[in-house]
Amino acid sequence: MAESIRRKLALVLVASLLALAAPFSVADTKETIEAGASQALGRLRAHSAAAGELVDQAHAVLVFPDVVKMGFGVGGEYGEGALQIGGVTQAYYVIAGVSFGLEAGAEYKSEVILFMTEEALRDFRNSSGWQVGVDGAVVLAKEGAEGAIDTLNSREPVLGFIFSNRGLIFNLSLDGAKITRIAR
């Protein structure tokens, strides 16, 4: 019961933070999202040649160039992105999530999700809202020997990368994040 109350309070807090920030935020335009996606993919390729090869092998790439995560004890994250097939944007999406733990402040990161099979892409596109860990699993890149990306999980249907300007981030998760298509 205490856990239920804690979660409800957390949701109210996150909703309040988002409501306060709403008047100051403007939804990104198609051009802004696409330019950000292109820059994010360039940074990912610069961080890891193996990641670039996986991007090239993917049936589709979902790029969230600027995901902001903020909170104090309870946090939330939000970002807008583009689904690209063959380098051409097909649709626009938002990613949002709530997290619990020792958090304070705000951080920016990029998230890239690779659909390695046609079936995984079809399941994603046919959903009205896709929750990571519920509607499909995203296997995040793992650090292998000598700091390289472990490509053993490249056989998974959906792969993910989280990174900042400093490089790949290996200790985070996308579980629980909700991805929803938006009109642009």
Where are these regions (language model features)?
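Bacterial N-terminal signal peptides that target proteins for export
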Residues: 2-13
